[in-house]
């Protein structure tokens, strides 16, 4: 469910409304007036919510009635499976794009409610210092003894823990920051993730309705970008250190005491377990897990899971010893062969 600290609810919408907005077809006309006022991932069904399935494969393993009270947009060939699960069904050849087209009619991110730089409802703890030009939104909460640098923007509902420091020009939206954190200049935290759907050759952006959760004692480097989750949260665990110019995509999950060197990037839903280390310019593919205490060397691309405690390098990344053996073999193959001397 979208956190009301960060999002205004605009619904409800009936299935008839959804069909008009998305171009989807209602499978059973008797459900046309059923309404939804929230959204949910398919694996976490909630009555009165809208969800989507890109194929019937995601539905076949669920028990009968599992989606009772949920409205689901799915491909036409998956309609019978969704009906078996008790869902009110809409069909579309591009369910993700249809779902995306409906979201702005159900929710919007909260805007700055007044013309004041600091909203009267914001709570600012004792001893906290604000630089020139700071903007603080409705319902935001800042702990004690914080330092908020010039021209920082703290969005509605955001929370910042005690003794945290924000350098100039930091932007926070849809985010909770722990205590004793250090966010360096130009970091942008909590903006929309890079969620894209395609329908009939046209791209559709997906409004993200999640948040960013950052634990205590975390450092975020200058000009880092951290996207909020699509449904849930993008997470960074306590005492992790993120270097300058890193990107963390929607729903990435970073554990505690993780180190990411500069220019590293995580794709959506990547998982970095506790005490892992990423060298400079490391890229981690979506849904890939870097195990506890694992290391990935600089300029590597982790396209598959890295087991706990191992050291991987290369593009694609692989265990260090294997990588070095392959390099040695390539060097051997690349050596010029001895030329046979010409005869007399």
Swiss-Prot record:
Its EC number is 2.3.1.191. Keywords: Acyltransferase, Lipid A biosynthesis, Lipid biosynthesis, Lipid metabolism, Repeat, Transferase. The keyword Lipid biosynthesis applies. The active site is at residue 250. It catalyses: a UDP-3-O-[(3R)-3-hydroxyacyl]-alpha-D-glucosamine + a (3R)-hydroxyacyl-[ACP] = a UDP-2-N,3-O-bis[(3R)-3-hydroxyacyl]-alpha-D-glucosamine + holo-[ACP] + H(+). One of its GO terms (biological process) is lipid A biosynthetic process. Transmembrane segments: none annotated. It is an enzyme of class 2 (transferase). Pfam families: Hexapep (PF00132). Gene3D superfamilies: Hexapeptide repeat proteins, MurE/MurF, N-terminal domain. The keyword Iron does not apply. Pathway: Bacterial outer membrane biogenesis; LPS lipid A biosynthesis. GO terms for molecular function: N-acyltransferase activity. GO terms for cellular component: membrane. It comes from the Bacteria. Belongs to the transferase hexapeptide repeat family. LpxD subfamily. Catalyzes the N-acylation of UDP-3-O-acylglucosamine using 3-hydroxyacyl-ACP as the acyl donor. Is involved in the biosynthesis of lipid A, a phosphorylated glycolipid that anchors the lipopolysaccharide to the outer membrane of the cell. Homotrimer. PANTHER family: UDP-3-O-ACYLGLUCOSAMINE N-ACYLTRANSFERASE, UDP-3-O-ACYLGLUCOSAMINE N-ACYLTRANSFERASE 1, MITOCHONDRIAL-RELATED. This is UDP-3-O-acylglucosamine N-acyltransferase.
